[in-house]
Amino acid sequence: MTGDKCEIHNCPALSDVDAAIQILRHLGCKVIRDGHTVEVDSSVITVSEIPDDLMREMRSSIVFLGAVLARTGKAEISSPGGCEIGLRPIDLHLSSMRKLGAEITEEHGRLYCSLGKSLHGADITLSFPSVGATENIMIAAAAADGTTVITNAAREPEISDLADFLNGCGAKISGAGDSTVVIEGTKRLHGTCHTVIPDRIEASSYLIAASATGGRICIKDVIPAHIGALIPVLSEAGCDITTSGRWICLSAPPRLKRVKMIRTMPYPGFPTDAQAIVGAMLSVADGTSVIIENIFESRFKHVTELMRLGAKISVEGRMAVIEGSKYLTGANVVAPDLRGGFALITAGLAANGKTVITGTQHLDRGYEAPEKVLKLLGADVRRINENDGTEKQETRQLAENIGKPAGESAEDCTDRHSQEADDRYNIRQGK
């Protein structure tokens, strides 16, 4: 959107990032990846359409709508992909773009977006504090004429992080992190360097996994305030938690206690992305716990797989009642989605015997080399190739798989993505 070079640091090696880079390259951007740094040169944009196969790679592909529309005055996209965890309509995105001046029509599953003149500021009230819609509005409005006010905006830390990035590019955004965000449009944005905030859900996942196994863990480069809704849940379960600066340390008891009630809510409430994982943890707690899922209506698909391990969980609508078991037993299970996959890892670590998880390609969307992290924490876990049973040595190859390998120019860089085998985790009890 800036027409300049932007350098993004602390960018994780995830398949969703790979997908975003593919989209940027398709649009005409030059993208160089070196480890956890990504450089994007958007000085030349050659197309304004994104093919269906690229849109379906990830849910957040929809946020390209605002950027492409602002840059080229038109956009052609389809509905995004991502995990199947329930209805996630894009109506808030489309209605917001229309308020900013876009004309949008749908034909054969494709959305055709154009501008009469240019984007203009507007007052937009969201019926739900959608993270993606808030991001899309912020991106488009940053280059619009006039002032845009978002009411009932998402308050997640990622919204504040995006505002910091856009402001670094010359945008004028205030209020990010609160329910009302004000964007004063500017004619010219420029390149910047930006460091992405730590992933709060990744940190939460490892804290929960350590809790489920009665273990101890210290995580650095985390912002404890960003996981403020999880800490009291883990404390109620009997964990001892200390924080200091960008550190958080947890020590779990041999047997967790029940957590009376957890309700997922938009930030700063308990995150829906941690719901499945904490449910796996509570399946080995002492007593009965209740989880109510208020964000997505189909986010208990992992429960059937947890029950194969011996978890005692009953689901009625958006409520799950978890009767803690003293022991789980290893089994063959299938990861239904990203967070459900890590929930199965958590349960497998706490179970007696070996657990084999297939469908783990979902994990690559949100976790960088989780098997390596778990090994560092003392888990007996291997990632193996499904086709020949050999251990997979490298989950991601940062510079080699995407971006510019050493000594190769960005212009000569070819697509180095290899077709990923269907792989799985072998997990032995991590206690």
Language-model features and meaning:
Residues 1-403, 425-431:
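Short, structured segments at the rim of ligand-binding sites
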